Amino acid sequence: THLLCRPGEVKGEVEIPPGTGLVGINSMVRHSVAGSPYSDTRIGAFMGKKIINDIRARTGRGALDYLTELTVEEFRAQYASEIPDKMVGSQFLTKHKTHDDPVTKIQPDATYRVAGPTRHPVEENERVLRFMEALRAAKNGDEKSLTAAGECMYGAHESYRDNCQLS
């Protein structure tokens, strides 16, 4: 099923090519999205979105509702250099007032990773689109596309680990 996570819209089905299987492995490692690493990553992504929206406002463009509205090319060309790698909560609040997330609260004394958590959803959205296209191509007989789909899956894990530092 293809979900568009803005906030969660089912866009349709993407068939798994004949002769292809997907395997999930239960590592038995417990993960909770309620803990600080996940909250801090979410805060960092919302900080990045706020910085981008402030830039957009200064240049007469409308605000983004979701980071995934940006292409990777747009993000890299127009915003990536403006997003700090890390930022202390109090510095962010002084400059931007809020991060516009009703679910999390910025702690003034905490240091948040901003660049990686902001980059992840933009790049992940593009990876998902490439993954679906690869599955469609494989269904039409292009077996090299299955390798491309696998590379997208590895890329998703690497981004989650490196940009979000959650794996």
Name every feature range the model reports, one short phrase each.
Residues T1-S167:
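C-terminal nucleotide
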